[in-house]
Amino acid sequence: MRHKAGLLFFIVLAAAAVIICSGGLGGQQKYISYSVLGGFSKMSQKSFSKVLFHPDLQQKPMIALTFDDGPKAGVTDWLLDELEKRNVKVTFFLIGSQADLPENRETIRRMAEDGHQIGCHTYHHVQMTTLSENQQKQEILQWYQAVSSIIGDFSYAVRPPYGCVNNAVCRSLNVPVILWSVDTEDWTGKSAGEIADYVISEAKDGDIILLHDIFEESVQGAVMALDDLMRRGYTFVTVNDLLADRDIAIQSGKVYRQAAQGGK
């Protein structure tokens, strides 16, 4: 069946009249227009190359697991071990005060070395909408100083604690804001099995899933769900990679909750 599908794919491509319609000056996206059986459509050259040379990858559903409030000694380290075994990358939204704890420095260094994405969850885990603009900026600056002292300079996105964000916060922070499309509510005392079952039942292609790596049950449930969904054909990636795969530009001051097909 797979060989037949691949053959059909290339027959369709052979029938397509492909025309490069815009060169994309100054770093703009390059697009390809194509005609298949009389109909016209358009996709980026990046996406077209993916379909042409990696048709199986284009079909694969993707999910981004995200973990807030850490790191926590022992718990986050166990999670990193399990992710390494599976060659899975996730996104960690760290609290700056946690990063300043000596016992967490090596864990954060390992996150970066293992290829995980590191984002900001403020220094004190405060509700950003209650702060002045100067206080908001100080929270982010103090966080960045704590984390960059461990892993060096890097670009980052912010996840405001409690998901509380408004236009004023977005303008003040001037970085991408990452929220979520699936909330596991793992902080309510759920068991690992309950967390896993919820993720498995609710997760779909393009979702950004909210978890916390300060609870043993949460990281255990995440790994259980990970194994189940990988068997079903899902790939797990960082938030940045999820958005990039869908050709969704990551822009400062913009809020992202998921990455649906086509960037919707």
Predicted regions and their residues:
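Hydrophobic "anchor" residues on beta-strands that sit immediately upstream
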Residues: A64, Q117, I208
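Acidic/histidine-rich, surface-exposed loop or edge segments in extracytoplasmic proteins
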Residues: K60-F67, C120-V126
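N-terminal pre-catalytic segment of deacetylase/amide-hydrolase enzymes
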Residues: M1-L65, P71-N87, P102-E106, L226-D228, ...
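Acidic (Asp/Glu)-rich catalytic clusters
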Residues: L79-N87, P102-H121, L173-N174, Y198-S201
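Catalytic domains of cell-wall/extracellular-matrix polysaccharide-remodeling enzymes
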Residues: W78, E113, H125-Y256
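Active-site metal-binding loops of divalent metal-dependent hydrolases
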Residues: F67-G70, S97, T122, D213
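Acidic/histidine-rich helix-loop elements
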Residues: S33-S41, L94-S97, P102, Q127-E133, ...
